[in-house]
Amino acid sequence: MEHNKAGSSGQCPVMHGGLTSASMSNMDWWPKALNLDILHQHDSKTNPLGADFNYREELKKLDVEALKRDLKALMTNSQEWWPADWGHYGGLMIRMAWHSAGTYRIADGRGGGGTGNQRFAPLNSWPDNANLDKARRLLWPIKQKYGNKISWADLMILAGNMAYESMGLKTFGFAFGREDIWHPEKDIYWGSEKEWLAKSGGENSRYSGQRDLENPLAAVMMGLIYVNPEGVDGNPDPLKTAQDMRVTFARMAMNDEETVALTAGGHTVGKAHGNGKASNLGPDPEGAELHEQGLGWNNHTSRGIGRNTVTSGIEGAWTTHPTRWDNEYFYLLLSYEWQLTKSPAGAWQWEPVNIKEEDKPVDVEDPSIRYNPMMTDADMALKIDPEYRKISERFYKDPAYFSEVFARAWFKLTHRDMGPKARYFGPDVPAEDLIWQDPVPAGRKDYDVNAVKAKIAASGLSISEMVSTAWDSARTFRGSDKRGGANGARIRLAPQKDWEGNEPARLGKVLAVLEKIAAESGISIADTIVLAGNVGIEQAAKAAGVNVTVPFAPGRGDATIEQTDVESFEVLEPLADGFRNWQKKHYVVTPEEMLLDKAQLLRLTAPEMTVLIGGMRVLGTNYGGSQHGVFTDRVGALTNDFFVNLTDMSYTWKPTGRNSYEIVERKSGKVKWTATRVDLVFGSNSILRAYAEVYAQDDNKEKFVKDFVAAWTKVMNADRFDLV
């Protein structure tokens, strides 16, 4: 072995060429390849706490009141390295919590504050999150003290809650239960722009048509949480900004009243920072030098802290007393005329005309100095937009009502991605059930499961009907925001009962049979639907020569239409389901990519996705009875035929359309089967083919059945947080 060349050029002979930082990855070489990495995230290999760590058990040891006291003390314990504005960190902590929770979007349930992802790229380095690294460093001594008993995710949101309480707001409540991740998510699409704060209309823009924001995005620019505070594309126009606000907040499931409350309540305290030159700031945390130790936006050319801090570039406080909860925001916004100006950093902002001296906030360091308050374009939208103005006027006239609406909206903002109340923990969990929590009443557990199974088996329903209905009921689950799933049996309610992908005619027939059995047995329809799917699988396994009992956990309840926000559930409608070989229409995204997205939301691994596809095909569960991918002559038997025939080199594959193929016998030229892209990707993609070959092996027929049952049970129980 010769190392002289590497050594003589100053390169390390051991690591030279190793994949440690910059290098061409497989995705760089083959950008159209499926990114299966999204199915393999956040496992024990990256978690320093180990596979046996149980956060809920750790929470039971937490002294909640002591933690809250420490957080309140932190608010006024100003540090020299990053001084608190007016001696109070409340505004900074609220912004940190807001921007942690505020990445949530209802379309796919991704984002939000439930994982502590603000600690990692890209969020830790978004322009809109500038200097929030300082907030997390201020929290570190408290995190260090309480250790595993409090996650970063919970701590960041709780810090925002305590900030509001320390300034006089009566909050609605708080729930612990957010578990930390240990590396950035690989499944969240933040946009395709190649630069921060890219304007609409440019390359890879998230906008099309008449300012139509790409789904599932809920922010107007790459690197922002919601809207541009200076105006659309940085051009002040409150009416246009109002439209951006309406879209982005709606994509977080917030209505106009909640939007006004959150905007005003967020700006009642704290300030924006732009008293200096943005050009003096160093790189963001991910781009900073090693010795910066994960801190970004450092100013090494001027003071850069206190009154000289630069963050957004906008400068000033919104209210006269920015460290207390009051109604001054609406007083100033609605009582004064406002004119457009620029901050010292060159950012557009609005300042009042002829404001009284006593209405001006004091300097963050010297109370003898007063400055004009300011408003962003988003704030001015609350005054100029007619609907927002009506709400603002009501809040101004009724401060108590404003405080109540804000407290509830803040709770919704910071808890929306946590899922049902079964996941909530702690002494401050509100007793009230809120419709956005998708409440489900508890179901019975004390009944004879085998007796119900016998009734289902004798009902005349086919294996396909039973399995398809159970799958359709459970497949709505999203591991992102913990919504959907079989619990509640909302498949029988609007809007789900009418979704095209649920085949309403077939669904209605099956539900009529199962509802009768549920009523006779005194159990929930939700349990009966899942149990029917299990019965179908057991029958299919027996037909394949394998005796198996599918695990079942009773206790699901039946939700009512009054407990269901129909509009909110519309976003759960499947546009495609590769497991049932169905697409509502053709999309830019390929069918196999949509399958991958669905599998990730169901929290499936690639092997689990693979075995489910193979099983669902031979069970005859395709949408509309389609024969695509049904590579078997024994439909209804849980065999590994799908994989055996997919990997058989006796066949060749020919495209017949955009998403259709024929599988042809090489010798005779006879068409044996038809398929879709979703079917053939398990023979085309090298990783998926490796899994398919495992299940095609002669010695793995029983393993296939057992693995299918395990993956099926995982999906059926995905929303059973009461079992944890």
Curated annotation (Swiss-Prot):
GO terms for molecular function: catalase activity; heme binding; metal ion binding. It catalyses: H2O2 + AH2 = A + 2 H2O; 2 H2O2 = O2 + 2 H2O. Formation of the three residue Trp-Tyr-Met cross-link is important for the catalase, but not the peroxidase activity of the enzyme. Binds 1 heme b (iron(II)-protoporphyrin IX) group per dimer. Its EC number is 1.11.1.21. It comes from the Bacteria. Its cofactor is heme b. GO terms for biological process: cellular response to hydrogen peroxide; hydrogen peroxide catabolic process. The active site is at H99. GO terms for cellular component: cytosol. Homodimer or homotetramer. Belongs to the peroxidase family. Peroxidase/catalase subfamily. This is Catalase-peroxidase. It comes from Vibrio cholerae serotype O1 (strain ATCC 39315 / El Tor Inaba N16961).
